Amino acid sequence: MESAKSISKIVKSLFLFLFLGTIASAQNFKLLRYDENYESLKDSSRNFYENLKFVPLNQEKDFYLSFGGEARYEYVDFNNEDWGRLNIGHNNFLLQRYDLHADIHLGKNFRVFAQLRSALQDGRINGPRGIDEDQLNIQNLFLDVTLWQQKDKKLILRAGRQELDYGSGRLISVREGPNARLYFTGGKIMYASSRFSIDAFAMMADTIYAGVFDNKMSKQLNLWGAYSKIIFPKAGNLDLYYLGIKRNESLFEQGIAPEKRHTAGTRFWKYGGGFIYNLEAAYQFGSFGSGNINAWTASADIGYSFENTKFKPTINLRNDYISGDLNKNNENLQTFNPLYPKGGYFGFSPQVGPVNLIDIHPYATLDLLPELKMQVDVVFNWRYSTNDGVYRPSGTLNLAGSASDERYIGTAYLANFTYSVNKYISVVSGIQYFKTGAFINDIIPNSKDGVFFNARLGFKF
Protein backbone atom coordinates (compact mmCIF):
# COMPACT_ATOMS: atom_id res chain seq x y z
CA MET A 1 0.00 0.00 0.00
CA GLU A 2 2.90 2.39 0.76
CA SER A 3 4.27 1.76 -2.75
CA ALA A 4 0.90 2.69 -4.22
CA LYS A 5 0.84 5.91 -2.16
CA SER A 6 4.35 6.80 -3.37
CA ILE A 7 3.30 6.45 -7.00
CA SER A 8 0.21 8.55 -6.20
CA LYS A 9 2.39 11.38 -4.82
CA ILE A 10 4.74 11.33 -7.82
CA VAL A 11 1.87 11.44 -10.31
CA LYS A 12 0.08 14.21 -8.39
CA SER A 13 3.25 16.34 -8.39
CA LEU A 14 3.70 15.93 -12.13
CA PHE A 15 0.08 16.79 -12.84
CA LEU A 16 0.25 19.86 -10.61
CA PHE A 17 3.23 21.11 -12.62
CA LEU A 18 1.47 20.41 -15.90
CA PHE A 19 -1.72 22.11 -14.75
CA LEU A 20 0.03 25.28 -13.59
CA GLY A 21 2.65 25.48 -16.32
CA THR A 22 2.48 26.29 -20.00
CA ILE A 23 2.13 23.06 -21.95
CA ALA A 24 2.81 22.69 -25.63
CA SER A 25 0.38 20.82 -27.81
CA ALA A 26 1.16 17.22 -28.77
CA GLN A 27 -0.59 14.17 -30.17
CA ASN A 28 -3.80 12.95 -28.58
CA PHE A 29 -3.38 10.32 -25.90
CA LYS A 30 -4.26 6.78 -26.93
CA LEU A 31 -6.44 4.24 -25.14
CA LEU A 32 -3.38 1.97 -25.12
CA ARG A 33 -0.58 4.30 -24.09
CA TYR A 34 2.03 2.13 -25.77
CA ASP A 35 0.52 3.11 -29.15
CA GLU A 36 1.84 6.67 -28.74
CA ASN A 37 5.03 7.74 -30.52
CA TYR A 38 6.92 10.95 -29.75
CA GLU A 39 9.78 10.54 -32.20
CA SER A 40 8.55 13.68 -34.00
CA LEU A 41 10.02 15.73 -31.12
CA LYS A 42 13.51 14.52 -32.04
CA ASP A 43 14.60 17.57 -34.06
CA SER A 44 12.59 20.27 -32.30
CA SER A 45 13.36 22.53 -29.36
CA ARG A 46 11.55 21.13 -26.35
CA ASN A 47 9.99 22.65 -23.24
CA PHE A 48 9.85 20.84 -19.89
CA TYR A 49 6.84 18.72 -20.85
CA GLU A 50 8.28 17.75 -24.23
CA ASN A 51 11.54 16.82 -22.51
CA LEU A 52 9.52 14.23 -20.56
CA LYS A 53 8.06 12.88 -23.78
CA PHE A 54 11.40 12.64 -25.62
CA VAL A 55 14.63 12.02 -23.69
CA PRO A 56 17.54 11.27 -26.09
CA LEU A 57 19.93 8.58 -24.84
CA ASN A 58 22.64 8.95 -27.49
CA GLN A 59 23.99 11.59 -29.82
CA GLU A 60 22.09 10.26 -32.85
CA LYS A 61 18.84 10.36 -30.83
CA ASP A 62 17.72 6.98 -32.14
CA PHE A 63 17.98 5.67 -28.56
CA TYR A 64 15.41 7.60 -26.55
CA LEU A 65 13.07 7.42 -23.59
CA SER A 66 9.51 8.73 -23.13
CA PHE A 67 7.57 9.11 -19.86
CA GLY A 68 3.81 9.37 -19.30
CA GLY A 69 1.10 8.73 -16.77
CA GLU A 70 -2.42 9.25 -15.51
CA ALA A 71 -4.38 10.06 -12.38
CA ARG A 72 -8.12 9.48 -12.16
CA TYR A 73 -10.50 10.26 -9.30
CA GLU A 74 -14.12 9.10 -9.31
CA TYR A 75 -17.07 9.51 -6.97
CA VAL A 76 -19.77 6.85 -7.32
CA ASP A 77 -23.26 6.95 -5.82
CA PHE A 78 -25.44 3.86 -6.26
CA ASN A 79 -28.95 3.41 -4.94
CA ASN A 80 -30.50 -0.08 -5.05
CA GLU A 81 -27.63 -1.89 -6.71
CA ASP A 82 -28.88 -5.14 -8.25
CA TRP A 83 -32.44 -3.77 -7.96
CA GLY A 84 -32.59 -4.10 -4.18
CA ARG A 85 -31.69 -7.80 -4.02
CA LEU A 86 -28.62 -7.05 -1.85
CA ASN A 87 -30.65 -4.88 0.58
CA ILE A 88 -27.88 -2.28 0.63
CA GLY A 89 -29.88 0.75 -0.43
CA HIS A 90 -27.64 3.81 -0.72
CA ASN A 91 -24.00 2.99 -1.46
CA ASN A 92 -21.46 5.71 -2.24
CA PHE A 93 -17.69 5.30 -2.57
CA LEU A 94 -14.50 6.72 -4.07
CA LEU A 95 -12.23 5.22 -6.74
CA GLN A 96 -8.70 6.26 -7.65
CA ARG A 97 -6.36 5.17 -10.42
CA TYR A 98 -2.70 6.11 -10.94
CA ASP A 99 -0.16 4.96 -13.48
CA LEU A 100 3.34 5.79 -14.66
CA HIS A 101 4.99 4.40 -17.79
CA ALA A 102 8.34 4.51 -19.53
CA ASP A 103 8.80 3.77 -23.25
CA ILE A 104 12.40 2.96 -24.22
CA HIS A 105 13.37 2.85 -27.92
CA LEU A 106 16.73 1.26 -28.72
CA GLY A 107 17.22 2.06 -32.36
CA LYS A 108 14.70 1.04 -35.02
CA ASN A 109 14.40 -2.62 -34.04
CA PHE A 110 14.07 -2.84 -30.26
CA ARG A 111 11.71 -1.30 -27.74
CA VAL A 112 10.78 -1.88 -24.07
CA PHE A 113 7.56 -0.55 -22.57
CA ALA A 114 6.96 -0.67 -18.80
CA GLN A 115 3.94 0.58 -16.83
CA LEU A 116 2.95 0.51 -13.16
CA ARG A 117 -0.70 0.95 -12.22
CA SER A 118 -2.50 1.43 -8.91
CA ALA A 119 -6.31 1.12 -8.59
CA LEU A 120 -7.79 1.98 -5.18
CA GLN A 121 -11.28 1.90 -3.65
CA ASP A 122 -12.62 3.42 -0.47
CA GLY A 123 -16.03 3.29 1.19
CA ARG A 124 -18.01 0.68 -0.77
CA ILE A 125 -20.35 -0.98 1.74
CA ASN A 126 -20.05 -4.48 0.30
CA GLY A 127 -16.29 -4.21 -0.36
CA PRO A 128 -14.36 -3.76 -3.59
CA ARG A 129 -15.32 -5.66 -6.70
CA GLY A 130 -12.67 -7.17 -8.95
CA ILE A 131 -13.04 -4.16 -11.24
CA ASP A 132 -12.44 -1.67 -8.39
CA GLU A 133 -9.15 -2.41 -6.67
CA ASP A 134 -5.66 -3.69 -7.45
CA GLN A 135 -3.41 -1.65 -5.19
CA LEU A 136 -0.24 -1.96 -7.24
CA ASN A 137 0.66 -4.12 -10.21
CA ILE A 138 2.81 -4.26 -13.32
CA GLN A 139 0.26 -3.47 -16.01
CA ASN A 140 2.61 -3.61 -19.02
CA LEU A 141 6.15 -4.93 -19.36
CA PHE A 142 7.06 -6.14 -22.84
CA LEU A 143 9.77 -6.20 -25.47
CA ASP A 144 9.10 -5.36 -29.12
CA VAL A 145 11.42 -6.66 -31.82
CA THR A 146 10.97 -5.41 -35.39
CA LEU A 147 11.59 -8.50 -37.52
CA TRP A 148 11.08 -6.85 -40.90
CA GLN A 149 10.23 -3.42 -42.26
CA GLN A 150 9.79 -2.06 -45.79
CA LYS A 151 8.19 1.32 -46.55
CA ASP A 152 4.72 1.17 -44.96
CA LYS A 153 4.94 -2.54 -44.11
CA LYS A 154 6.16 -3.85 -40.76
CA LEU A 155 6.37 -7.15 -38.86
CA ILE A 156 6.83 -6.94 -35.07
CA LEU A 157 7.16 -9.59 -32.36
CA ARG A 158 5.97 -8.60 -28.86
CA ALA A 159 6.67 -10.69 -25.74
CA GLY A 160 5.71 -10.05 -22.12
CA ARG A 161 2.85 -8.53 -20.12
CA GLN A 162 0.55 -6.37 -22.24
CA GLU A 163 -2.91 -4.87 -22.54
CA LEU A 164 -5.16 -5.95 -25.43
CA ASP A 165 -8.08 -4.16 -27.07
CA TYR A 166 -9.72 -5.16 -30.34
CA GLY A 167 -12.63 -3.89 -32.39
CA SER A 168 -15.54 -2.36 -30.49
CA GLY A 169 -14.53 -4.17 -27.30
CA ARG A 170 -17.31 -6.76 -27.41
CA LEU A 171 -14.93 -9.67 -26.77
CA ILE A 172 -11.40 -8.40 -26.06
CA SER A 173 -11.19 -5.09 -24.21
CA VAL A 174 -8.73 -3.34 -21.93
CA ARG A 175 -11.81 -2.36 -19.86
CA GLU A 176 -11.21 1.39 -19.58
CA GLY A 177 -14.50 2.28 -17.85
CA PRO A 178 -13.95 0.30 -14.63
CA ASN A 179 -11.17 1.31 -12.26
CA ALA A 180 -8.87 -1.73 -12.80
CA ARG A 181 -7.89 -2.44 -16.40
CA LEU A 182 -7.24 -5.91 -17.83
CA TYR A 183 -3.91 -7.28 -19.01
CA PHE A 184 -2.39 -10.58 -20.18
CA THR A 185 1.06 -12.15 -20.39
CA GLY A 186 2.25 -13.87 -23.55
CA GLY A 187 3.39 -13.36 -27.10
CA LYS A 188 2.00 -11.56 -30.11
CA ILE A 189 3.17 -11.16 -33.70
CA MET A 190 1.85 -8.13 -35.61
CA TYR A 191 1.86 -7.36 -39.32
CA ALA A 192 0.67 -3.96 -40.56
CA SER A 193 0.53 -2.15 -43.89
CA SER A 194 -1.43 0.89 -45.06
CA ARG A 195 -4.67 -1.04 -45.66
CA PHE A 196 -4.27 -4.34 -43.85
CA SER A 197 -3.19 -5.44 -40.39
CA ILE A 198 -3.32 -8.71 -38.46
CA ASP A 199 -2.29 -9.75 -34.95
CA ALA A 200 -1.84 -13.34 -33.83
CA PHE A 201 -1.41 -13.98 -30.09
CA ALA A 202 -1.28 -16.54 -27.28
CA MET A 203 -1.90 -15.25 -23.75
CA MET A 204 -2.16 -16.20 -20.09
CA ALA A 205 -4.42 -14.35 -17.65
CA ASP A 206 -3.64 -13.55 -14.02
CA THR A 207 -5.79 -14.23 -11.00
CA ILE A 208 -6.25 -10.71 -9.60
CA TYR A 209 -5.89 -9.96 -5.89
CA ALA A 210 -6.39 -6.54 -4.31
CA GLY A 211 -2.93 -6.17 -2.72
CA VAL A 212 0.53 -5.07 -3.86
CA PHE A 213 2.27 -7.22 -6.53
CA ASP A 214 0.20 -10.26 -5.42
CA ASN A 215 -1.49 -11.24 -8.71
CA LYS A 216 -0.85 -14.83 -9.78
CA MET A 217 -0.21 -15.92 -13.36
CA SER A 218 -2.31 -18.87 -14.50
CA LYS A 219 0.66 -20.68 -16.13
CA GLN A 220 -1.68 -22.07 -18.78
CA LEU A 221 -2.95 -20.70 -22.07
CA ASN A 222 -6.23 -18.84 -21.42
CA LEU A 223 -6.63 -16.85 -24.63
CA TRP A 224 -5.35 -17.27 -28.16
CA GLY A 225 -6.38 -16.15 -31.61
CA ALA A 226 -5.97 -13.70 -34.47
CA TYR A 227 -7.58 -10.36 -35.28
CA SER A 228 -7.34 -8.62 -38.66
CA LYS A 229 -8.54 -5.35 -40.17
CA ILE A 230 -8.94 -4.50 -43.86
CA ILE A 231 -9.51 -0.89 -44.91
CA PHE A 232 -11.75 -0.20 -47.90
CA PRO A 233 -11.37 3.47 -48.85
CA LYS A 234 -14.72 5.34 -48.59
CA ALA A 235 -16.68 2.11 -47.92
CA GLY A 236 -15.41 1.37 -44.42
CA ASN A 237 -13.43 -1.24 -42.53
CA LEU A 238 -13.77 -5.01 -42.29
CA ASP A 239 -12.57 -6.95 -39.23
CA LEU A 240 -12.19 -10.74 -39.30
CA TYR A 241 -11.22 -12.64 -36.17
CA TYR A 242 -10.87 -15.97 -34.41
CA LEU A 243 -10.57 -16.23 -30.61
CA GLY A 244 -10.09 -19.26 -28.38
CA ILE A 245 -10.36 -19.53 -24.58
CA LYS A 246 -9.84 -22.30 -22.04
CA ARG A 247 -11.12 -22.10 -18.46
CA ASN A 248 -10.99 -24.74 -15.76
CA GLU A 249 -14.26 -23.52 -14.26
CA SER A 250 -16.96 -21.47 -15.98
CA LEU A 251 -20.31 -20.60 -14.42
CA PHE A 252 -23.56 -20.38 -16.34
CA GLU A 253 -27.10 -21.07 -15.17
CA GLN A 254 -26.65 -24.61 -16.49
CA GLY A 255 -23.86 -25.16 -13.96
CA ILE A 256 -20.09 -25.07 -13.41
CA ALA A 257 -17.75 -27.02 -15.69
CA PRO A 258 -14.50 -26.75 -17.68
CA GLU A 259 -14.94 -24.72 -20.86
CA LYS A 260 -13.06 -24.65 -24.15
CA ARG A 261 -14.66 -22.23 -26.56
CA HIS A 262 -13.88 -20.97 -30.07
CA THR A 263 -15.28 -17.74 -31.53
CA ALA A 264 -15.29 -16.83 -35.23
CA GLY A 265 -16.57 -13.37 -36.07
CA THR A 266 -16.65 -10.40 -38.40
CA ARG A 267 -17.30 -6.69 -38.10
CA PHE A 268 -18.01 -4.10 -40.80
CA TRP A 269 -17.86 -0.50 -39.63
CA LYS A 270 -17.43 3.15 -40.53
CA TYR A 271 -17.25 6.22 -38.31
CA GLY A 272 -16.99 9.89 -39.25
CA GLY A 273 -19.19 12.43 -40.97
CA GLY A 274 -22.48 11.39 -42.56
CA PHE A 275 -23.74 7.80 -42.45
CA ILE A 276 -22.09 5.72 -39.69
CA TYR A 277 -22.48 2.04 -38.96
CA ASN A 278 -21.08 -0.81 -36.88
CA LEU A 279 -22.29 -4.29 -37.84
CA GLU A 280 -20.91 -7.35 -36.05
CA ALA A 281 -21.70 -11.06 -35.82
CA ALA A 282 -19.94 -13.98 -34.13
CA TYR A 283 -20.50 -17.72 -33.76
CA GLN A 284 -19.16 -19.83 -30.88
CA PHE A 285 -18.53 -23.57 -30.66
CA GLY A 286 -16.55 -25.90 -28.40
CA SER A 287 -17.20 -27.86 -25.22
CA PHE A 288 -18.66 -27.18 -21.77
CA GLY A 289 -18.21 -30.18 -19.51
CA SER A 290 -19.43 -33.17 -21.51
CA GLY A 291 -21.70 -31.06 -23.73
CA ASN A 292 -21.24 -29.03 -26.89
CA ILE A 293 -21.37 -25.24 -27.25
CA ASN A 294 -23.54 -23.65 -29.94
CA ALA A 295 -23.88 -19.90 -29.32
CA TRP A 296 -24.00 -16.68 -31.33
CA THR A 297 -24.44 -12.91 -31.34
CA ALA A 298 -25.42 -10.29 -33.91
CA SER A 299 -25.41 -6.53 -33.55
CA ALA A 300 -26.39 -3.59 -35.77
CA ASP A 301 -25.56 0.01 -34.82
CA ILE A 302 -26.62 2.50 -37.50
CA GLY A 303 -26.69 6.28 -37.35
CA TYR A 304 -25.94 9.62 -38.91
CA SER A 305 -23.46 12.34 -37.90
CA PHE A 306 -24.43 15.92 -38.79
CA GLU A 307 -20.93 17.37 -38.69
CA ASN A 308 -21.82 20.61 -40.51
CA THR A 309 -24.81 21.41 -38.27
CA LYS A 310 -24.79 23.45 -35.07
CA PHE A 311 -23.95 21.25 -32.03
CA LYS A 312 -22.81 18.51 -34.47
CA PRO A 313 -25.55 16.04 -33.41
CA THR A 314 -25.35 12.30 -34.04
CA ILE A 315 -28.30 9.95 -33.82
CA ASN A 316 -27.98 6.15 -33.62
CA LEU A 317 -30.16 3.10 -33.25
CA ARG A 318 -28.62 -0.11 -32.05
CA ASN A 319 -30.06 -3.63 -31.79
CA ASP A 320 -28.30 -6.65 -30.24
CA TYR A 321 -29.24 -10.33 -30.20
CA ILE A 322 -27.13 -12.49 -27.88
CA SER A 323 -27.99 -16.15 -27.38
CA GLY A 324 -28.85 -17.85 -24.09
CA ASP A 325 -29.23 -21.47 -23.04
CA LEU A 326 -32.39 -23.19 -24.29
CA ASN A 327 -32.50 -26.03 -21.76
CA LYS A 328 -30.40 -26.11 -18.60
CA ASN A 329 -31.27 -29.77 -18.00
CA ASN A 330 -29.34 -31.14 -20.98
CA GLU A 331 -25.58 -31.15 -21.37
CA ASN A 332 -25.35 -28.80 -24.39
CA LEU A 333 -24.94 -25.05 -23.92
CA GLN A 334 -26.27 -22.20 -26.07
CA THR A 335 -25.20 -19.35 -23.76
CA PHE A 336 -22.93 -16.82 -25.45
CA ASN A 337 -19.68 -15.99 -23.64
CA PRO A 338 -18.44 -12.37 -24.09
CA LEU A 339 -14.90 -13.49 -23.07
CA TYR A 340 -13.17 -10.30 -21.84
CA PRO A 341 -15.65 -7.49 -22.62
CA LYS A 342 -15.48 -3.83 -21.71
CA GLY A 343 -17.72 -2.95 -18.79
CA GLY A 344 -19.64 -0.13 -20.45
CA TYR A 345 -20.72 -1.63 -23.75
CA PHE A 346 -24.42 -0.89 -23.05
CA GLY A 347 -23.81 2.47 -21.36
CA PHE A 348 -21.71 3.45 -18.36
CA SER A 349 -22.09 1.17 -15.32
CA PRO A 350 -24.60 -1.11 -17.05
CA GLN A 351 -26.70 -3.44 -14.92
CA VAL A 352 -27.20 -6.04 -17.66
CA GLY A 353 -24.33 -7.83 -19.41
CA PRO A 354 -23.98 -9.07 -23.01
CA VAL A 355 -25.31 -12.60 -22.40
CA ASN A 356 -28.81 -14.01 -23.11
CA LEU A 357 -30.01 -10.61 -24.22
CA ILE A 358 -32.08 -8.76 -26.79
CA ASP A 359 -31.83 -4.98 -26.61
CA ILE A 360 -33.03 -1.95 -28.53
CA HIS A 361 -30.79 1.03 -27.85
CA PRO A 362 -31.42 4.49 -29.37
CA TYR A 363 -28.88 7.16 -28.42
CA ALA A 364 -27.75 10.62 -29.48
CA THR A 365 -24.83 12.99 -28.90
CA LEU A 366 -24.52 16.79 -28.96
CA ASP A 367 -21.50 19.08 -28.77
CA LEU A 368 -23.05 21.67 -26.45
CA LEU A 369 -19.75 23.57 -26.51
CA PRO A 370 -16.50 22.77 -28.32
CA GLU A 371 -15.26 21.35 -24.99
CA LEU A 372 -18.57 19.87 -23.72
CA LYS A 373 -20.17 16.74 -25.19
CA MET A 374 -23.48 15.24 -24.06
CA GLN A 375 -24.85 11.76 -24.76
CA VAL A 376 -28.32 10.46 -23.94
CA ASP A 377 -29.37 6.81 -24.21
CA VAL A 378 -32.41 4.61 -23.66
CA VAL A 379 -31.83 0.86 -23.48
CA PHE A 380 -34.73 -1.63 -23.57
CA ASN A 381 -33.63 -5.10 -22.34
CA TRP A 382 -35.23 -8.53 -22.84
CA ARG A 383 -33.96 -12.04 -22.13
CA TYR A 384 -33.27 -13.95 -25.33
CA SER A 385 -34.18 -17.27 -23.67
CA THR A 386 -36.55 -17.63 -20.72
CA ASN A 387 -34.57 -20.75 -19.71
CA ASP A 388 -31.46 -18.70 -18.92
CA GLY A 389 -30.74 -15.88 -16.52
CA VAL A 390 -29.42 -12.32 -16.42
CA TYR A 391 -25.65 -11.86 -16.45
CA ARG A 392 -23.33 -9.11 -15.26
CA PRO A 393 -21.34 -6.85 -17.63
CA SER A 394 -18.32 -9.15 -17.08
CA GLY A 395 -20.33 -12.13 -18.35
CA THR A 396 -20.77 -13.82 -14.95
CA LEU A 397 -24.19 -15.03 -13.82
CA ASN A 398 -26.18 -12.57 -11.71
CA LEU A 399 -29.78 -13.83 -11.56
CA ALA A 400 -30.92 -17.34 -12.43
CA GLY A 401 -33.96 -17.08 -14.68
CA SER A 402 -35.39 -20.50 -15.54
CA ALA A 403 -37.93 -20.18 -12.70
CA SER A 404 -39.67 -17.30 -14.48
CA ASP A 405 -41.48 -17.11 -17.83
CA GLU A 406 -41.19 -13.33 -17.93
CA ARG A 407 -38.88 -11.93 -20.62
CA TYR A 408 -38.61 -8.16 -20.09
CA ILE A 409 -35.70 -7.19 -17.81
CA GLY A 410 -36.13 -3.42 -17.69
CA THR A 411 -35.35 -0.04 -19.21
CA ALA A 412 -32.21 2.04 -18.60
CA TYR A 413 -32.28 5.82 -19.09
CA LEU A 414 -28.85 7.48 -19.25
CA ALA A 415 -27.33 10.94 -19.62
CA ASN A 416 -23.59 11.52 -19.77
CA PHE A 417 -21.48 14.70 -19.98
CA THR A 418 -17.79 15.01 -20.89
CA TYR A 419 -15.96 18.31 -20.45
CA SER A 420 -12.40 18.61 -21.75
CA VAL A 421 -10.70 21.39 -19.79
CA ASN A 422 -7.75 20.95 -22.11
CA LYS A 423 -5.96 18.02 -23.69
CA TYR A 424 -4.67 16.84 -20.32
CA ILE A 425 -7.63 17.36 -17.97
CA SER A 426 -11.19 16.06 -18.37
CA VAL A 427 -14.33 15.88 -16.26
CA VAL A 428 -16.96 13.20 -16.88
CA SER A 429 -20.31 12.90 -15.12
CA GLY A 430 -23.34 10.72 -15.72
CA ILE A 431 -26.62 9.55 -14.26
CA GLN A 432 -28.56 6.37 -14.94
CA TYR A 433 -32.07 5.36 -13.92
CA PHE A 434 -33.03 1.69 -14.35
CA LYS A 435 -36.75 0.93 -14.33
CA THR A 436 -37.27 -2.73 -13.49
CA GLY A 437 -39.32 -4.91 -15.84
CA ALA A 438 -41.55 -7.93 -15.37
CA PHE A 439 -38.67 -10.43 -15.03
CA ILE A 440 -36.87 -8.50 -12.25
CA ASN A 441 -40.15 -7.93 -10.43
CA ASP A 442 -40.94 -11.65 -10.68
CA ILE A 443 -37.53 -12.89 -9.47
CA ILE A 444 -36.74 -10.30 -6.74
CA PRO A 445 -39.40 -9.78 -4.04
CA ASN A 446 -40.04 -6.06 -3.47
CA SER A 447 -37.62 -5.12 -6.26
CA LYS A 448 -36.60 -1.48 -6.57
CA ASP A 449 -35.58 0.74 -9.45
CA GLY A 450 -31.84 1.50 -9.53
CA VAL A 451 -30.21 4.95 -9.67
CA PHE A 452 -26.53 5.44 -10.46
CA PHE A 453 -24.48 8.65 -10.46
CA ASN A 454 -20.79 9.23 -11.00
CA ALA A 455 -18.38 12.14 -11.37
CA ARG A 456 -14.82 11.61 -12.62
CA LEU A 457 -11.80 13.88 -12.86
CA GLY A 458 -8.96 12.68 -15.06
CA PHE A 459 -5.39 13.88 -15.76
CA LYS A 460 -3.01 12.53 -18.40
CA PHE A 461 0.45 13.50 -19.52
Where are these regions (language model features)?
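Extracellular/periplasmic loop regions
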Residues: 28-46, 254, 292-402
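Surface-exposed loop and membrane-interface regions of Gram-negative outer-membrane beta-barrel proteins
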Residues: 78-96, 106-152, 170-173, 211, ...
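Transmembrane beta-strands of outer-membrane beta-barrel pores
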Residues: 73-79, 116-122, 161-165, 193-195, ...
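N-terminal periplasmic/intermembrane-space "pro-region" immediately following the signal or transit peptide
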Residues: 2, 24-90, 315
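Membrane-embedded beta-strand positions of outer-membrane beta-barrel proteins
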Residues: 67-69, 114, 157-159, 189, ...
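Signature for the C-terminal beta-barrel architecture of outer-membrane proteins
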Residues: 147, 151-157, 170-171, 175-329, ...
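Outer-membrane beta-barrel "beta-signal"
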Residues: 28-40, 448-461
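Outer-envelope beta-barrel architecture signal
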Residues: 61-67, 108-112, 153-155, 194-196, ...
